[in-house]
From Swiss-Prot:
Pfam families named among the record's database cross-references: PH, SH2
Chain's role: Binds differentially to the SH3 domains of certain proteins of signal transduction pathways. Binds to phosphatidylinositols; linking the hemopoietic tyrosine kinase fes to the cytoplasmic membrane in a phosphorylation dependent mechanism.
Disease: Cherubism: An autosomal dominant syndrome characterized by excessive bone degradation of the upper and lower jaws, which often begins around three years of age. It is followed by development of fibrous tissue masses, which causes a characteristic facial swelling.
Name of the encoding gene: SH3BP2
Protein name: SH3 domain-binding protein 2
InterPro entries: PH-like_dom_sf (IPR011993), PH_domain (IPR001849), SH2 (IPR000980), SH2_dom_sf (IPR036860), SH3BP2 (IPR035848), SH3BP2_SH2 (IPR035847)
Keywords of this entry: Disease variant, Phosphoprotein, SH2 domain, SH3-binding
Residues covered by the SH2 domain: 457-555
Annotated Basic and acidic residues bias: 252-266
Length: 561
């Protein structure tokens, strides 16, 4: 008997309801029951679940066709099935509960549709619990449901005599929160249909997904909040939608500089170009020619980089003479050879500093001759400062616009969110040039509105209770600000959920962010091109299904002011 007790089955993590029902043997009972919510936010909710008792494990699904369970637990260590009189309400007339021998473990509450159903479920659960312990109690079955009620419940509700030690149930059970029942759904019927079209199809792909998720099961010490539908693996696709800045950034760079792809491979100096474009410092002028001369010198001294490395002094003196006579030829060669000469300096940095003083002198001697050529190779790294020198006279016309008090703030707006490389991070560079010709007040407001959402707003969790805990931690007294908000991952489907603290009801409110045709919305009538513009809208417009709730404070963000 003791050897048998050590082999209590462990709930299977990802199995469809139909697959479980068709497994040979082991299914004691299956049917629909109402299950009490497991989190603090859902204690008053009793969603309908399809429950299967299989080999002394209880599984519950959203429906009989679900691809994976909402949760499951082993009956190991549970020693009593009782009526739950304290949970009886007008909606739950026939509740019952399954109690663990240890008070540290969860008590599970279910509600049947009739007295007969409750007797049947309780009798079968009692039989499963006593499988290894009380062979004499096995005659308890559904036929007892027709017997006297008091005698039936007296026999069923008697605790099973078991010992606690052999049951390692801490990390075997798991539960997926029924959070989709707690969302504030849109008032109009159309968004509901849109949700069906958008969200129901992904419910079936998850069955193959749990395989990469399997390492996560061992990481969960207490399993009552485990997410089994695999939203974790499905979530990476949405961030690329909001994280497109990186791709867009590369595209913008390629438009800005056609030779950028070539430079990206050989040299780490590429980041210098964007800096010069947006904020050209005059201090870089003497060093830029120095950076430009080594490529000219390497090509004029020898056709390949190998002869250049042995004798640095001799090559440098001869290159000075050659450069004085053939500067234009070398600069033309640079356009085709600038990839090859930049390879060696990365592998042999010491020679470059040794020769740099001579290059700088040469650069000081020949600035007029070089200034005539930069038009040919504006794309390379070095020619940027000369190219920017030319527009300086034009800049003399700009001071009339630039002295505006708003404009100096724009650089701060670009750099202020240290944690926010958002998909709008480069949107400032486009409006800034046209805005110089326009009147200042309106454009500066537009630029301000395009500040990206900080990364701290996106919380990497699927639990509303976890977000509530984070919100309360922001205040010493545990009272979050009204309108404090963040965006978390959805626990049931691929997508995002807007979580807002409602001070009037002293709780968080969840709004699923729907998406269709690259548009985002909380309710069907108002569509937005991005999550950022949607959040901006609800800073000044009341959220759906509420009288006065606005988005006011992004979580974890302290402004630059």
């Amino acid at each position: 008997m003791a050897a048998e007790e050590m082999h209590w089955p462990v709930p299977m993590k990802a199995i469809g309801a139909q697959n479980l029902l068709t497994m040979p043997g082991g299914v004691a009972k299956a049917g629909y029951l109402h299950k009490k919510g497991g989190t603090q936010l859902q204690l008053l909710k009793w969603p309908l679940r399809f429950v299967i008792i299989h080999k002394r494990c209880v599984y519950y699904f959203k429906s009989s066709t679900s691809a994976s369970p909402q949760g499951a637990f082993s009956l190991s260590g549970y020693n009593r099935v009782m009526r739950a009189a304290e949970e009886t309400t007008s909606n739950n007339v026939f509740p019952f509960k399954i109690i663990h021998i240890s008070k540290k473990h969860r008590t599970w509450f279910f509600s049947a549709s009739s007295e007969e159903e409750r007797k049947s479920w309780m009798a079968l659960l009692r039989r499963e619990i006593g499988h290894f312990h009380e062979k004499k109690d096995l005659p308890l079955d559904t036929s007892d449901s027709s017997s006297d009620t008091d005698s039936f419940y007296g026999a069923v509700e008697r605790p099973v005599d078991i010992s606690l030690s052999p049951y390692p149930t801490d990390n075997e059970d798991y539960e997926h929160d029924d959070e989709d029942d707690s969302y504030l759904e849109p008032d109009s019927p159309e968004p509901g249909r849109l949700e069906d079209a958008l969200m129901h199809p992904p419910a079936y792909p998850p069955p193959p997904v749990p395989t990469p998720r399997k390492p996560a099961f061992s990481d969960m010490p207490r399993a009552h909040s485990f997410t089994s539908k695999g939203p974790g693996p499905l979530l990476p696709p949405p961030p690329p939608k909001h994280g497109l800045p990186d791709v867009g950034l590369a595209a913008e760079d390629s438009k800005r500089d056609p030779l950028c792809p070539r430079r990206a491979e050989p040299c780490p100096r590429v980041p210098a170009t964007p800096r010069r474009m947006s904020d050209p410092p005059l201090s870089t002028m003497p060093t830029a020619p120095g950076l430009r001369k080594p490529p000219c010198f390497r090509e004029s001294a020898s056709p390949s980089p190998e002869p250049w490395t042995p004798g640095h002094g001799a090559c440098s003196t001869s290159s000075a003479a050659i450069m004085a006579t053939a500067t234009s030829r070398n600069c033309d060669k640079l356009k085709s050879f600038h990839l090859s000469p930049r390879g060696p300096p990365t592998s042999e940095p010491p020679p470059v500093p040794a020769n740099k003083p001579k290059f700088l002198k040469i650069a000081e001697e020949d600035p007029p001759r070089e200034a005539a050529m930069p038009g040919l190779f504006v794309p390379p790294v070095a020619p940027r400062p000369p190219a920017l020198k030319l527009p300086v006279p034009e800049a003399m016309a700009r001071p009339a616009v630039l002295p505006r008090p708003e404009k100096p703030q724009l650089p701060h707006l670009q750099r202020s969110p240290p944690d926010g490389q958002s998909f709008r991070s480069f949107s400032f560079e486009k409006p800034r040039q046209p805005s110089q010709a326009d009147t200042g007040g309106d454009d500066s407001d537009e630029d301000y509105e395009k500040v990206p959402l900080p990364n701290s707003v996106f919380v990497n969790t699927t639990e509303s209770c976890e977000v509530e805990r984070l919100f309360k931690a922001t205040s010493p007294r545990g009272e979050p600000q009204d309108g404090l908000y963040c965006i978390r991952n959805s626990s049931t489907k691929s997508g995002k959920v807007l979580v807002v603290w409602d001070e009037t009801s002293n709780k968080v409110r969840n709004y699923r962010i729907f998406e269709k045709d690259s548009k985002f919305y909380l309710e069907g009538e108002v569509l937005f091109v991005s999550v950022g513009s949607m959040v901006e809208h609800y800073h000044t417009h009341v959220l759906p299904s509420h009288q006065s709730l606005l988005l006011r404070h992004p979580y974890g963000y302290t402004g630059p002011r």
